[in-house]
């Protein structure tokens, strides 16, 4: 069975666990529509990304 040679200090343990925290996602306001969206992601309502039409905008089906 593997046994550690040295005791892990609280500082080293905390540095190891520092990457485990959940971070709140960031949002930016879209220049064209004014809606909030994730940075470097396309706007799902309009289908635009960096001024280009990537996806067809969704139309309301009756």
UniProtKB/Swiss-Prot annotation:
Source taxon at top rank: Bacteria
Pfam families: Ribosomal_L32p
Family membership noted in the UniProt record: Belongs to the bacterial ribosomal protein bL32 family.
Transmembrane segments: none
Regions of compositional bias (Basic and acidic residues) in chain numbering: 28-44
Basic residues bias spans: 1-16
Annotated Gene3D superfamilies: Single helix bin
Organism per entry: Azorhizobium caulinodans (strain ATCC 43989 / DSM 5975 / JCM 20966 / LMG 6465 / NBRC 14845 / NCIMB 13405 / ORS 571)
A Gene Ontology cellular-component term: large ribosomal subunit
Classification of source organism: Bacteria, Pseudomonadati, Pseudomonadota, Alphaproteobacteria, Hyphomicrobiales
Key words of the record: Ribonucleoprotein, Ribosomal protein
GO terms assigned for molecular function: structural constituent of ribosome
BP GO annotations: translation
Protein name (record): Large ribosomal subunit protein bL32
Region (Disordered), start-end ranges: 1-62
InterPro entries, per the entry: Ribosomal_bL32, Ribosomal_bL32_bact, Ribosomal_zn-bd
